[in-house]
Structures are given as structure tokens and as C-alpha cells.
Amino acid sequence: MSSDLEATIARLQRGVVETFPHVPDSVKPEENLWAYLRQTQRPLRIKFGIDPTGSEIHLGHSIVLRKLRQFQDAGHCAVLIIGDFTAQIGDPTGKSEVRKQLTPEEVAANVQTYLEQVRPILDFETPGRLEIRYNSEWLAKLDLRKVLELLGTMTVGQMLAKEGFAERYAKETPIFLHEFLYPLMQGYDSVAVAADVELGGTDQKFNIAVGRDLQRHFRLPTVQFGLLMPILVGTDGVQKMSKSLGNYVALTESAASMYSKLEKIPDALVNQYIELLTDLPLDSLPTHPRDRQKALALAVVSQYHGQELALQTQAELAAIVTQGQTAQAGSIPEYSLGEFQFPVKLTYVLSHTKLCPSSSEARRQIQGGGVRLNGEKITDVDFTLTAPEPYVNQVLQVGKKKFLRFVP
């Protein structure tokens, strides 16, 4: 067995929670994904589906996308399914209530922003390495006969055993019939694209298993493996990363904002973040947690903003600390975002928090380059904070001596 192939497999195994089916030490390709990869003579089709239900992708979403890129780099074809059809229903996985249905126009707008955000992660250039498909290609064409055939492959009992449905059923919260179709539609995607492997978070095991069952039902020559990645804990160190909880780092954030958030994550999360969000070698990390945080922040910011800007950002933020104007929690005043009605102009925030004596002085400070938000210079006098969540734990600075930290 070549050392290059084994190194590739080791990279693909990094951070993986589970593959299924999996018979340990089996050399049969149908029983062990890693045996399959060692023996296959063709590029595999590696499926990952995303429903464009929002406008932002955060680092939690990037975990599976990075794994998809690793398969691309190993010579396989990433099949990125854009769930433009399923997004109009919404994945009920882990949800305690029915999901809001989106209009086709909302979905189309989200699709464009999603594709722009995944470009720094996936290989869009190498021929044969990426196939982008929209599941409306096949799902919009299903007639009632085919829908009934899909429904006939599962029982109500199987559906109610699914996470989210069981909880809602026990609480007598309504479960609508169209929600039962979601796992079947995601599974049918695997039939339509003839997936060899499907990637997902640990919460997607049920849906991926449905895809395996449907591939058997429709007699595909190969049945997909499932590969599950962890659900990333948010920057609060408590709950999963989520925009609604404000504990997320968006891929579209500025270099300064991204670096600042990552540099301050709890020590207990640093190693997991490094393993899942970077390619840093795990056997040669800095000993001190603070140094590991800096290595993490620099590596992640470099991915999305380039190494030059990442190094510049690191130096600028370090300079603030060196001057004794540190952004640590105990050293600067905190101000609750709950004091504002959103959206709110930055000039109002500056005057209301007494960082500036008046709105006119706030405008002058902004125009003169004296205002920074999480290390990033703000020069637009009309800059507006649209919602509180993105600004939790961010530091607002005026000049060299005035600081405050936003809290919920």
C-alpha cells in the first residue's frame, strides 16, 4: 500500500465521528469505506447537500464543506446538491416546531450568496472535481405515482423515531405530512446523482440512511456510505454554533472580527476547532492555550481573507494589547445590546454609550478614522447595526483609550 494513499486516507479520517456501514478491519469494500477507498479504481461521487434557507454560512457549516474539499484533493468528485426544492419545505431534523416555508424568490437569492461563500473552500477550477446540482431538477418532476412509491418505502413508526418528530409527537405539537417527505426527498437526491458517499453532520444519520435504503430500492449498482462530522460548539462553549444564538463566526465576517472571536474561544474548544477548521498538524501544536488560540485564528482567517491580511490583522490586534488597551473581558466596560432598538446607527450608539459626547462628534470621529469595531476601522458615517446577534462580545473603540464590549 503506497504511503501517499495512506496519508490521504489519514487526512480524510481527521475529525470524522462515524462512517457507516463499518465493519472494523474488514477489507470488503462494501463493509468499510476506507477499504473501499484503497481498492477503488475510479473517482467516487461524494455528495453533500445544503438547503439555502438563510443568507450566511458560518464555520459550523464549513466543517463538512472542508471534508468535501479533502475528497476533491484526493481525486474524487464533489457533488454539491443545492436544495432549492427542499428548502421550500425545510429540514425538520432536530426542530421542535414546523419550519417556515420559503418562497422560490427567497431561495434563489440565498443560493447566490451560498455559492459565493463556499468558493474559498471548494475546488471550482479543476475539471471533474465539482458537480453542482439543484434538486429541483428531479424533485419538481416527480408525479404522484413516484411520490407514493417513495412513501411506501417507510413506515410512520420509522418516521416518528426520527429526532425531532418523536419529541413533537410526545408533546402533541403538530407534525405535518409534508415534513415526512423531507428525509425521502433528501434520500432520493442520492438516487438521482448516484452518490457513493454522503457527508453530513451527526444529526443527518437518519436522512443519509434513508438514501442508502432508496438506492437499494431503486436497484442502483452501488449503495452509498455515510460519513458523519461533529456539530461544532459555538464560541460560547455551550451550545452548537448558530446564528440565532449569536455564538457563530460567519464566513463573510471581516478579518478583524473573525480573528478576534476565534482568539477568545474557551480553552476547551481550541483543539477541536483546530482539528475541524484547519489543516494545522495536531502533533506539533503550541503548548500554551493562548498560543494555540492565536494559531487557530491566524489559520482560519488566512483561509478566508488570505495570509497577508491575516498577519496584518494579527499584528494590529496585538498592538492594541501591547499598548495596554486590552480587549479582555475584565479590563473594559460592558454595554448591553438590549439597550438599543435595532436597526441602530453607529453614531447613535457612540453618543448613547458616552464614547462620544454627541452624534456630531461621533460623525467626526468616524470620518477621521478614529472608530474601530472589533479592530476594523469604520469610515461610513451611516454604518448601521442591523441586529444584536453579530455584535455580541465585539469591542467598540474610539481613539486609543476609549473601549466598550457589547454583551447580550
UniProtKB/Swiss-Prot annotation:
Subunit details: Homodimer.
Question: Where is this protein chiefly located?
Answer: cytoplasm
* The keyword Nucleotide-binding appears for this protein: yes
Q: Which domain of life is it from?
A: Bacteria
Q: Give the protein name, as stated in the record.
A: Tyrosine--tRNA ligase
**Source species, please?**
Thermosynechococcus vestitus (strain NIES-2133 / IAM M-273 / BP-1)
Motif 'KMSKS' region boundaries: 240-244
Q: Which SMART domains match?
A: S4
What does it catalyze? tRNA(Tyr) + L-tyrosine + ATP = L-tyrosyl-tRNA(Tyr) + AMP + diphosphate + H(+)
**Might you give the EC number(s) for this enzyme?**
6.1.1.1
Q: Which family does it belong to?
A: Belongs to the class-I aminoacyl-tRNA synthetase family. TyrS type 2 subfamily.
Residue ranges annotated as motif 'HIGH' region: 52-61
Query: A Gene Ontology MF term for this entry?
Result: tyrosine-tRNA ligase activity
Which PANTHER family is this protein grouped with? Answer: TYROSINE--TRNA LIGASE (PTHR11766:SF1), TYROSYL-TRNA SYNTHETASE (PTHR11766)
Question: What is the top EC class of this enzyme, as a single word?
Answer: ligase
Cellular localisation: Cytoplasm
